[in-house]
């Protein structure tokens, strides 16, 4: 039945057009943002999970950054200890050479003095972010971030206290530079021509061996900490990638699917507009019934 008061066909076509426009707006939003769930109203449960996981991922990345700082501290100290071992071994070689009757003792002493200066230079240069583990009392300790744990309240970093004084090359002077009266190399720094005399070479070699033992132990400690930090950093990176991937599966839009849906909805919109136009024109047909 055709009525001049109510155009049911037009009402139906208009409702269809509204639905198509609503779906089209949603799809266009997904295509432009890349998100299937961009706001809580899209899916409150998934949006809440994604928001929490993004926050956790930020904390994991912050922990990874802290691990990077810790790794840098350890690497600087490790490099310093390793260089010191090389220099002390060179001093050891010079001392052993004194057993040769053809060796010029004065030249050996000149070389040893240069090596002593090199040890001081290594100690003074081994600083990162204001911390120098190569200078300090035998009881000196330093804290370094070595890992992190995830708890119900979030992500917390874990630290390890390193007794750096057990392998510190020298004590720390009032001016912040090496004080050669302390540290594992203090006795080597105190070598004089007397220490290189034939009667004292054996004692001096024992001093060198003691220092090498302390430095080797220090290198082992630093190496194990460095390895642990590397493993934790690798885990943090993998965990961050896994979280990001999980969030993506929850809220990201399938662009191929959305693109296909967009094309279909645009076609539906055109058809709905035509349908509404046809429905509206039906009232004009009633007028033709009254024309002579």
Residue ranges and their predicted role:
Residues 259, 266, 270-273:
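Extended, low-aromatic, Leu/Ala- and acidic/polar-enriched alpha-helical coiled-coil segments
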Residues 129, 262-263:
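Short loop/turn microsegments at loop-to-beta-strand junctions
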Residues 1-12, 16, 32, 36-253, ...:
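Amphipathic alpha-helical coiled-coil/heptad-repeat segments
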Residues 253-262:
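A glycine-biased, small/acidic residue-tolerant capping/turn segment at secondary-structure junctions
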Residues 23-24:
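N-terminal glycine-rich anion-binding loops that anchor highly charged ligand groups
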């Amino acid at each position: 039945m055709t009525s001049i008061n109510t155009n049911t066909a037009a009402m139906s076509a208009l409702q269809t057009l509204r639905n198509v426009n609503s779906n089209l707006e949603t799809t266009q939003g997904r295509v432009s943002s890349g998100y299937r769930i961009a706001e809580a109203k899209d899916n409150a449960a998934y949006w809440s999970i994604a928001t929490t996981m993004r926050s956790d991922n930020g904390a994991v990345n912050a922990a990874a950054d802290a691990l990077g700082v810790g790794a840098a501290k350890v690497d600087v100290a490790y490099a310093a200890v390793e260089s010191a071992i090389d220099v002390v071994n060179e001093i050891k070689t010079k001392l052993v050479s004194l057993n040769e009757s053809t060796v010029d003792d004065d030249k050996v002493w000149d070389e040893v003095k240069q090596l002593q200066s090199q040890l001081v230079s290594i100690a003074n240069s081994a600083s990162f972010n204001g911390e120098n583990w190569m200078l300090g009392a035998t009881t000196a300790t330093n804290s370094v971030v070595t890992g992190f744990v995830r708890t119900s309240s979030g992500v917390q970093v874990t630290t390890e206290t390193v007794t750096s004084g057990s392998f510190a090359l020298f004590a720390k002077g009032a001016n912040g530079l090496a004080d050669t009266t302390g540290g594992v190399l203090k006795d080597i720094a105190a070598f004089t021509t007397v220490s290189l005399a034939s009667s004292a070479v054996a004692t001096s070699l024992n001093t060198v061996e003691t220092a090498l033992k302390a430095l080797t132990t220090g290198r082992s400690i630093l190496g194990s900490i460095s390895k642990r930090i590397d493993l934790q950093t690798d885990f943090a990176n993998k965990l961050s990638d896994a979280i990001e991937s999980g969030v993506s599966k929850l809220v990201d839009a399938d662009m191929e699917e959305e693109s296909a849906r967009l094309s279909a909805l645009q076609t539906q919109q055109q058809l709905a507009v035509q349908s509404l136009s046809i429905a509206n024109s039906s009232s004009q047909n009633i007028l033709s019934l009254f024309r002579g």
